[in-house]
A protein has these predicted regions:
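Short capping/connector residues at structural and topological boundaries
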Residues: 77-79, 113, 139-142, 202, ...
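Secretory/periplasmic and organellar redox-cofactor proteins
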Residues: 296-316
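The feature marks the mature, well-folded catalytic cores of soluble enzymes
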Residues: 1-168
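Ferredoxin-type iron-sulfur electron-transfer modules in oxidoreductases and energy-metabolism complexes
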Residues: 145-173, 184, 188-303
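Generic alpha-helical structural element
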Residues: 18, 22, 45, 104-107, ...
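Amphipathic alpha-helical surface "interface" segments used
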Residues: 53, 136-143, 270-274, 307-311
Length: 316
C-alpha cells in the first residue's frame, strides 16, 4: 500500500525500506487519494485502506503477470520466501498466470532450517512482530493437482555490483536482511529523513551500500552522515559492524583526496577552535543567533549555507 501511495504521487521515492511512506500523515494520503481517485476526502486509515483495495483488486484479478521480490531464496528446495503484512503479495504471486521474482544474489540461504532462523530475526527487528501476517513460500509453477498458482514461474537473480562487493572490504554488508533497524535508531536519519540520502538505501546501511554500488566519489557525503554512536551496530540482527565499515570509507576518502577543500579547511578550523575554549564558546553563541535569524518567524530553516543535501528532505 505504501508503494502504491508513492506511485500515485508521481513516483515519489520511499523514505524507509520497510515503511516507505512513514514521512506522510493520514491527511497527506487523504489529499492524494481525493486528487487522484476523485473520491470524497476521508482521513480514517481504515477507510483509506478500503479505498485503495477497491482500486487495486480489479488490477490484481486482471493481471497477466505478477512481479515480486523475495526476502530469501532457499537453495535446498529452489523456493522463494516473501514476508508481508498485507495480502497484496499473495494476490500478485498466485493470481496471474506468470510470476517473475526479482531479487539479489545475496538472498540465497542453504536450507529451510537456515531460513527459519532468519525468519525469526527479520520481523522482530523490522516491526517488532514475532512473525509477519503472511509468510509465503513459492516453489515453481502450480502442479497438475493444484487449483491455484502461476502457470509459469521465473526467478531473476540480480548481481548489479554484489559480486564486486563480495570481493572487497565491504563484503559484510551482504549479510544485511533489510530490516531497517539501523535507520530506526540512527540520530542522523531521524534528523534528516530518508530522502536526504539520495538513492535507494537510507540510513547507516545506505551510508555504506550507496558508495559501494555507485562509487565513493559519487556519494562523498554519506560515510560522514553518522555520529558513530554505534546504535546501528548494536541493533543489527546479523551483527554487521556498520560504524567500522563507515570508518573505512572515511579513511579511503582521505587517502584518495576525495574530500572537497572547503570541508577539509572547515575541519581544520574547527579542530583549531576546539582547542580555544573561549573562542569556541563565542563561536557557538554567534552560530545560535545566526540560526535563529535564519529561522525567522517560522522558526524553520529550509536551507543552510554550505550544507547542501542534509536539508533537502526535511526542515530544521
Amino acid at each position: 500500500l505504501g508503494e502504491y501511495i508513492l506511485q500515485l504521487n508521481d513516483n515519489e521515492p520511499p523514505s524507509h525500506i520497510v515503511m516507505p511512506v512513514i514521512h506522510k500523515t493520514a491527511e497527506d494520503v487523504a489529499d492524494l487519494f481525493h486528487a487522484k481517485h476523485g473520491t470524497p476526502r476521508k482521513t480514517d486509515p481504515a477507510a483509506l485502506t478500503r479505498e485503495a483495495r477497491e482500486i487495486l483488486r480489479p488490477k490484481f484479478l486482471s493481471a497477466d503477470m505478477g512481479v515480486s521480490g523475495a526476502n530469501f531464496l532457499i537453495a535446498e528446495t529452489g523456493s522463494t520466501l516473501i514476508v508481508t503484512n498485507e495480502g497484496n503479495g499473495r494476490l500478485c504471486t498466485t493470481l496471474p498466470r506468470l510470476h517473475v521474482a526479482i531479487t539479489g544474489i545475496e538472498k540465497v540461504v542453504p536450507t529451510l532450517e537456515d531460513v527459519t532462523t532468519l525468519l525469526r530475526l527479520l520481523p522482530r527487528s523490522a516491526t517488532g512482530q514475532a512473525i509477519t501476517n503472511y509468510v509465503s513460500l513459492h516453489t515453481g509453477p502450480k502442479r497438475l493437482e493444484e487449483t491455484d498458482g502461476p502457470q509459469q514461474f521465473h526467478i531473476v537473480l540480480v548481481d548489479n555490483g554484489r559480486a564486486k562487493l563480495l570481493a572487497g572490504e565491504m563484503r559484510e554488508m551482504l549479510r544485511c536482511i533489510r530490516c531497517g533497524a539501523c535507520m530506526n535508531h540512527c540520530p542522523v536519519y531521524q534528523a534528516v529523513g530518508g530522502h536526504a540520502y539520495g538513492w535507494v538505501y537510507p540510513g547507516p546501511m545506505g551510508n555504506i551500500l550507496t558508495p559501494s554500488y555507485v562509487g565513493l566519489e559519487n556519494a562523498i557525503a554519506l560515510p560522514n552522515a553518522a555520529t558513530m554512536c554505534n546504535q546501528c551496530g548494536v541493533v543489527c540482527p546479523v551483527k554487521i559492524p556498520l560504524p567500522d565499515l563507515m570508518r573505512k570509507l572515511r579513511e579511503e576518502q582521505m587517502q584518495r583526496g576525495l574530500k572537497p577543500w572547503p570541508e577539509r579547511l572547515g575541519l581544520a578550523l574547527w579542530g583549531w577552535a576546539a582547542q580555544q575554549p573561549a573562542l569556541y564558546s563565542l563561536g557557538t553563541r554567534i552560530a545560535v543567533r545566526f540560526m535563529k535569524w535564519m529561522g525567522g518567524t517560522e522558526k524553520l530553516i529550509h536551507r543552510l549555507p554550505l550544507a547542501s543535501g542534509g536539508r533537502d528532505g526535511r526542515d530544521l
